């Protein structure tokens, strides 16, 4: 088995072909299909005289089984003559050794020769292993990706779950394309709710519970004090109405909400005691969040938050807005009338009447600070589509302030999750969601007593498969679409689900375990022994993986990779009854192990990119 793309290029030369031309878009060392793109561009240019730089980008890919490996719409080359006739003429003149070329209307369809494709693709995968599909196109570029971003003392709701899954994938994807990525969790850790929380903790707080599970306990405290505040407000309104009915003056008492606002104002003014209480709640919550994210194979380079923008920086941003004549005053509040620049954007408030800031002000300061720190080429905010208007306003403000990096900011939005609840009630915390998924998966596994008895660590396997189920259900459709959270469907081994993906990987692992060959022996396999059409179909799919990642990167879509992985697993499943390994002669075994091993590697790479832990046994 050849072991490098250089050797493949040399083998093309020995067939009487010229060395492959160099294209800016081509990356033959990381993407084997680019070898064919380069070869086709070179050969077609000899036939029709069109410059190769025009032919190469006109070659279109498709992962549909019924489509050609590459298609070329003849009109894109702008050659005089009827496109149908040109397509037919060029197809007849094209060399027949490595590529089968047919004319289909105005299209040229290129199908790669199965044996040559197999000799190209499989050695590359075995050589590059976990690096197969990765490239260096983003080398030297920096991306800051802000995702998850829950609010302290509030539930980790479905929107945060989607942001976590999509954001972690985008971070992994950017790294796979050579980018330097900074993962940021921008916490909702500032605001009046902390005043309410501090008041509530004095009444309902428990130190042991706070240390054991700070996020859950602070949420419980917040719910209770909020209920107190609501009850108090209702009483104040009732007392006021009663006094007014009797013609008596009424002076409302200082409410819990009033006290909360005062507490937050002290925080903004730098009061040490108030900040000490807040900092303790924040630090304990972050410690717990880190444990939760670790369980999902997610890490952050920075835990940022609204609190981390200094008052000095926010004042600087407001002063800058004033100097640009963008600030207007309305009843003591400061706002920007963006409708003057875009009617759809309306007005955006940057400072309340009492002088306290809003998250818009803090987001402006945060973005400014972030660029000064990272000098990013791209800053991604992974936030639901409900915030589309907000980010349009924010980015417009960046533009009006003259920030050169304004166009480098991107809002990656997503739809809603509907009906996310457990069979025992509402699952409002990420830990709850994962625990229920684990329990549900464990129940499914226990239904097959024979297989369950063979699993060495069923609790750990159930946990991994449960987390896979959550991620895959969220990632199957386009991110902008809403989807219904379905526990039964999600935890099924039937259909295109997370559990099925894990099963497919573990089954591929078992193929290798059933025979005793070294990697070196498999890499020396005679690939000419792979002659079955279904084997060539699988090789074609394996060769498409680098392009799949490029498309996922282009559209920032998790579903692009997930859809591909299911196509891959279906193609592999079809081969189990055709390409037996056990009981076959040695050379046949090695060739088939080379194919199944490459399939496992690509499946593993894709699953890892999605943030999953591929299982060897289950």
Swiss-Prot record:
Region of interest called Interaction with tRNA, as start-end residue ranges on this chain: 60-61, 104-109, 496-510
Motif ('HIGH' region): 149-160
Binding site for L-arginine: 146-151, 160, 359, 363, 387
Membrane-spanning ranges: none
Molecular function as annotated in GO: arginine-tRNA ligase activity; ATP binding
Catalytic activity from the UniProt record: tRNA(Arg) + L-arginine + ATP = L-arginyl-tRNA(Arg) + AMP + diphosphate
Any one GO biological process: cytoplasmic translation
Keywords on record: Aminoacyl-tRNA synthetase, ATP-binding, Cytoplasm, Ligase, Nucleotide-binding, Protein biosynthesis
Main location: cytoplasm
Compartment(s): Cytoplasm
Protein's gene: mrs1
Annotated family: Belongs to the class-I aminoacyl-tRNA synthetase family.
Organism from which the protein derives: Schizosaccharomyces pombe (strain 972 / ATCC 24843)
EC number, as in UniProt: 6.1.1.19
Pfam families (UniProt xref): Arg_tRNA_synt_N, DALR_1, tRNA-synt_1d
Gene3D superfamilies registered for this protein in UniProt: Arginyl tRNA synthetase N-terminal domain, HUPs, Isoleucyl-tRNA Synthetase, Domain 1
Protein name, UniProt field: Probable arginine--tRNA ligase, cytoplasmic
Domain of life: Eukaryota
SUPFAM superfamilies associated with the record: Anticodon-binding domain of a subclass of class I aminoacyl-tRNA synthetases (SSF47323), Arginyl-tRNA synthetase (ArgRS), N-terminal 'additional' domain (SSF55190), Nucleotidylyl transferase (SSF52374)
GO CC term, one of those recorded: mitochondrion
NCBIfam families documented for this protein: argS
SMART domains: Arg_tRNA_synt_N (SM01016), DALR_1 (SM00836)
Function description: Forms part of a macromolecular complex that catalyzes the attachment of specific amino acids to cognate tRNAs during protein synthesis.
